[in-house]
Swiss-Prot record:
Region span, Disordered: 158-183
Zinc finger (NR C4-type): 24-44, 60-84
One Pfam entry name: Hormone_recep
Lineage of producing organism: Eukaryota, Metazoa, Chordata, Craniata, Vertebrata
Binding-site residues for Zn(2+) 1, renumbered to this chain: 24, 27, 41, 44
Record field: transmembrane: none
Origin species: Saguinus oedipus
One Gene Ontology term, aspect cellular component: cytoplasm
Protein name: Vitamin D3 receptor
Chain positions covered by the region annotation Hinge: 97-126
Recorded name of the encoding gene: VDR
UniProt free text on domains: Composed of three domains: a modulating N-terminal domain, a DNA-binding domain and a C-terminal ligand-binding domain. The 9aaTAD motif is a transactivation domain present in a large number of yeast and animal transcription factors.
Amino acid sequence: MEAMAASTSLPDPGDFDRNVPRICGVCGDRATGFHFNAMTCEGCKGFFRRSMKRKALFTCPFNGDCRITKDNRRHCQACRLKRCVDIGMMKEFILTDEEVQRKREMILKRKEEEALKDSLRPKLSEEQQRIIAILLDAHHKTYDPTYSDFCQFRPPVRVNDGGGSHPSRPNSRHTPSFSGDSSSCCSDHYITSPDMMDSSSFSNLDLSEEDSDDPSLTLELSQLSMLPHLADLVSYSIQKVIGFAKMIPGFRDLTSEDQIVLLKSSAIEVIMLRSNESFTMDDMSWTCGNPDYKYRISDVTKAGHNLELIEPLIKFQVGLKKLNLHEEEHVLLMAICIVSPDRPGVQDAALIEAIQDRLSNTLQTYIRCRHPPPGSHLLYAKMIQKLADLRSLNEEHSKQYRCLSFQPESSMKLTPLVLEVFGNEIS
């Protein structure tokens, strides 16, 4: 039995290397595969099967030791059959006519099952494909992977341990236009374009008033060296989020009031989602092209935030990165995040929910159709959990932001758009 097991074992994978020519072990002709436990050509395979089925007895007309080749293999059937047995061909591997028929039926059945399975497999509808195409285009128009606009921000200033500071470039440049300076060269397209939401729309909502006299909330100015630069970065990102949101299918069908509510409440969450593209797990930083724009945890603390926000933010970024989302999934997740019917203050929750359901169904179908396992396993549920994590991060960001915005020294470093979006808390 051990000998039988050995003879029926699969050949070494190296034997199937397509770059290595397959040679028939009987006659030396080109082999077509393993037949009856040996590598042979089609001719010797058929010869062995016929001989075994007929129980043929051959006699060598010579000395019983003929050399079998492709050219003379028909001259001596006895030595050819002997050679078949010598290289390991076994009659036990030959199927009966009934077994051959059953095998054919099984192959046919398997093909039919595969065809049925394929027909039942979910497919993206034309409408869903259109939604994905629109969102991809929206993202490409509002996210610059070269980060070339970062040079227009107020420069990053990183305070040394000894108290000194080193701006990455001369500090003479004024705050760019996205912080409210209309004379700057930076475009305000996503705020002031007739097709887009005007940033002044946000100013209809009053700033929240909270008591900031608690000395534990006071931040020394020396701790805020990165605040001007990161405030400009966030202001710039808010504009891009507005531009992306305006291109979400169905978003323009909402009232301007609901659009404002959704954008104000989701802006920081979408910014966190967007930033995952530049996040690297090698050193837990956000790398945005130029080394001056490589942001570490210490940079975020120098903008007034503490580990109560930073630690869960890093955990979120790592978890999201490990999901290895396709770009299609990434843009759908951002859209779903923005169009959330449970945001406080929305008026037409039913319409918002209908838009979000359409996006969610598209995401689920895309995962089933296009994201291969094992990555697709529970992927949708994991992505929805990320949205829940963002709500917690949003809440903590709001708490820490208030500490900044209600201190005149620090709020002066913020931009008007940041003050309007994050200062008018809807809670």
